[in-house]
Amino acid sequence: MSGLLYALLIIPMIGIFFILSFDSYNFNITSNNSNSGSFSEAGAGKNSGGELLKVLVINNELNFYKKIAFITTIMNLIVSLIIYILFDFSTNQFQFVQDALELSVYNIYLGVDGLSIYFVLLTTIIMPIALISNWNSITHNIKAYLIIILLLETLLLAVFLVLDVLLFYIFFESILPPLFILIGLFGSSNKVRASFYIFLYTLLGSLFLLLSILTMSSLIGTTYLDVLSKSNFEYTTQIFLFLGVFIAFAVKTPTVFLNSWLLKAHVESPLGGSIVLAGIVLKLSLYGIFRLILPLLPKISLNYTSIIFSIGIITIIYASFSTLRTIDIKELIAYSSVSHAAVYLIGVFSNIIQGIEGGILLGLGHGFVSSGLFICAGGVLYDRSGTRIISYYRGTAQVMPLFSILFFILCLGNCGAPLTLNFVGEFMSLYGTFERLPLLGLFSSSSMIFSAAYTIYMYNRIAFGGSFSKFFEENIGDVTKREFFLLFTLIIFTIMFGIYPSFILDGLHYNVTSLLFGV
């Protein structure tokens, strides 16, 4: 079983290799067929037949590539489930530790613990969903799209598996070029502007993270997490290190005044890109806090809690009011993501066990719910109407009853309604906030009111609002089997873990306790 972590990173690369290899092979076949009869009239007939064969082969290739990519992501999901089954949650040590590669005197180590395993599972669950979401809507450069998705899966998993902070930074930043290309190639009308926004914002923010990592390396002499976690930096040094790390993660979360890139990226990104962004990429900052701030810089994270809480509260209020005024459904969901990200940011900085565990649960729940909402908005509604303007939708409950039910359940999850994973995560996050700073906890709880307000307002205008919209005058049909499968899968995870959160909490408790108290 020592090669399971290798497999998580290698399987997507094998999928990319097969996509590229089969393309070259089929191209040679069609080229030979088209050139075989070019010297006679009979050959001309063969040539036209060869062209027809080429078209048929190309059409079959596209579906074949999609199947290869989908099977690849499913194989990775199976491997991650095997790792979860074999994982020992009674220890806080990294498990399945492997020396993946040796470069001169530098070794690359992989490992997984009770915190990272849930992010690995989230990644392997979301990636096949992101792949299927654009199964029919993307009709050009399909190979490039599939390769980007598989490459993103490898890079995201590498972030959660590496045991070296410098490698964490390298893979953390390596995600940007594929996202840049994904939005630039497959985005909407302002895709170039959006791709540059996401690249520049996150790259400039991460430069501060690099400076902090290099400072740690010069002071301690290593960048391995296990060694750094046993270090004790001076208080003044911790201040400067914290500023560098927090700025990078504040951009990635994102917090107030640093969220412009996320809104443009979500609105202009293809559906699969929005799902990856909301479901996984936004969780990189949450994971980074557990690796670089709480264990390495405990004094600052404890003493500056009120400042971080204030930033989170301002972000919640700003994002919520912005959500209430927007008319674009994808932009509304993006603002909602900013608000929920601020809540789990507050929870993990509460330095209370319940608050930290709640922040993780809310991050996981948000990954499921936001992905489902983006499928509803950018997949079901946009594919049928060609618009994202909320005022153009009304009365979908009359013509799309099954969709309206699924959409309503996801909206309940976004509100943090009981029996959903988001409710458990938000409740525990706010509990940790109240335990730490009751007054700021009171302001933080406004997120539950605001989220209910803008989510119900959105659903009411789309599902009801009088007679159905002109976009639905013809019989457009309810959700397809593919759309139902995607939405139902995400709903199952949201409700199952909402009813029985101990499935996650039991595995988290020992590692979170060790994180806080160094046991």
Swiss-Prot record:
Sorted UniProt keywords: Electron transport, Membrane, Mitochondrion, NAD, Respiratory chain, Translocase, Transmembrane, Transmembrane helix, Transport, Ubiquinone
NCBIfam families attached to this UniProt entry: NDH_I_M
Protein name per UniProt: NADH-ubiquinone oxidoreductase chain 4
Entry-linked Pfam families: Proton_antipo_M
Mitochondrion listed as a keyword: yes
Primary location recorded for the protein, binned into one broad class: mitochondrion
BP term (GO), one: ATP synthesis coupled electron transport
Record-stated family: Belongs to the complex I subunit 4 family.
Enzyme class label: translocase
InterPro entries found in the cross-reference section: NADH_Q_OxRdtase_chainM/4 (IPR010227), NADH_UbQ_OxRdtase (IPR003918), ND/Mrp_TM (IPR001750)
Protein function: Core subunit of the mitochondrial membrane respiratory chain NADH dehydrogenase (Complex I) that is believed to belong to the minimal assembly required for catalysis. Complex I functions in the transfer of electrons from NADH to the respiratory chain. The immediate electron acceptor for the enzyme is believed to be ubiquinone.
Chemical reaction(s) catalysed: a ubiquinone + NADH + 5 H(+)(in) = a ubiquinol + NAD(+) + 4 H(+)(out)
Topology in membrane: Multi-pass membrane protein
Any GO MF annotation of the entry: ubiquinone binding
Protein EC: 7.1.1.2
Cell location: Mitochondrion membrane
